[in-house]
Design a protein with these regions (language model features):
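C-terminal beta-strand-loop-alpha-helix "lid" module of Rossmann-like NAD(P)-dependent dehydrogenases
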Residues: 1-290
Length: 290
């Protein structure tokens, strides 16, 4: 067999092996996407009821540290990315948006410090020598309520302790399997309108009697609200990651199939040419002996 045919056979085998890997990764990402979507849907009733309670308490005045706007000296910027790659432009989109925002908010008297969730954001900002306060690189796209609450509690504690006077979160909002959108919001300090607009009005609202008082109930609900916002930010980011990876690996699998078809066509043409040449040589030799 001519060397060109051997080389084409080797390339076809290599692409087929790669196609098997990308197909398997697509299936794994699809399974993770379904689980993440189920977790998001399951969390909505709790979030809706929490928002309804906060909306009912919107007119309550309370002196709470989460509402306190202090002189801004240090700002903590949380960036949520993935730990693994092969998910298209997912990580590039969120890290680029965060970096553009950081450059636009580079004030002489304000220190911007990064708190990254995901190995990809950690690597990106390390290469560019941005100050990283903490990096969490072991979540692996898993929606873990206990870990998410621990992150939220840490952010609240450090804000209350005046270590940072503002906390901004960069995440990716899940729109659909094929669509996701980088976004950011101020987590702390809370603004009264944030809690008023937390939920859209849905028909007649329920009237509640608060014990021991509306102020006490609001004070108890605010940390839960922050926890819920952190949960949504991380859960939507991870769901977007799985959707992006499934789409990316699906495209890679399709492209591998097209490449296999092209290489097979080249191989068949090369084999046909080799056979034709051999026949011509045999006929030529027979004619010479005749």
């Amino acid at each position: 067999m001519p060397a060109s045919l051997k080389e084409l056979d080797r390339r076809i085998r290599s692409v087929k092996n790669t196609q098997q890997i990308t197909r398997a990764m697509k299936m794994v990402a699809a399974a993770k996407l379904r689980r993440s979507q189920d977790r998001l849907v399951a969390a909505r009733p709790y979030a809706a009821k929490l928002d309804e309670l906060l909306q009912g308490l919107a007119g309550t005045s309370i002196d709470h540290p989460f509402f306190e706007e202090r002189e801004l000296r240090r700002r903590l910027v949380v960036v949520v990315s993935s730990d693994k790659g092969l998910c298209g432009s997912y990580n590039a989109n969120i890290t680029r948006e965060a970096e553009v925002w950081l450059k636009a908010h580079a004030e002489a008297d304000v220190e911007n410090v990064l708190y990254v969730v995901g190995r990809k954001a950690n690597d990106y900002f390390k290469r560019r020598q941005w100050p990283i306060d903490r990096a969490i690189t072991d979540l692996n796209g898993t929606i873990d309520l206990e870990r998410f609450n621990a992150i939220a509690d840490e952010l609240m504690h450090r804000f209350v302790e005046d270590e940072f006077q503002e906390v901004v979160v960069f995440t990716t909002r899940f729109v659909s399997t094929l669509s996701y959108q980088p976004t950011h919001f101020t987590l702390l300090p809370l603004k009264p309108e944030d809690e008023e607009d937390a939920a859209e009005p849905a028909g007649a609202s329920t009237e509640y009697i608060y014990e021991p008082s509306a102020e006490a109930v609001l004070a108890a609900l605010l940390p839960k609200s922050v926890r819920n916002r952190v949960f949504n930010a991380l859960a939507e980011a991870f769901t977007s990651e799985h959707g992006a990876r499934m789409t990316s690996m699906g495209s890679a699998t399709d492209n591998a199939g097209e490449l296999i078809d092209t290489l097979t066509l080249f191989r068949n043409r090369a084999r046909q040419a080799a056979i034709t040449q051999e026949i011509s040589e045999i006929v030529g030799g027979a004619n010479a002996l005749a």
